[in-house]
């Protein structure tokens, strides 16, 4: 989370560390990951609702996965619908599995709602410094929205340090930062 927050909103031009994309953006940190394993879907749904009820314009979720039990998907789908109603953009990075998401379903996704596709939902994969998709990223002609820079991104790190990060999380943070400039 620290590196993503730095990509999005680190103070610009202060001579320290890195420059965030939208340094006027406010970060609302909500922990939904238990530390090991996958995030609890109930906690994800509650965090989405909390964020939109407290003014979040952009929500950056953890990576998609295929482990959403059917009975629990509705919790997240309903929370995403609430975010859509309140005008919040939801950004989710893909997993690094080299899987065609048009053939294998990953969650959350824009088609989770039975009453139609979500219009506020963006799925992001990582590209390299030349703009090419990274080799192990998931892909999909209809399920992936865009590729964004996600390799060797210099950002804040724990303990008042800085380092380079690579992955879908860096790409999705880049998109969230640009979205914050537009909002």
Protein language model regions, located:
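Catalytic-core regions of hydrolytic enzymes
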Residues: 36-56, 67-70
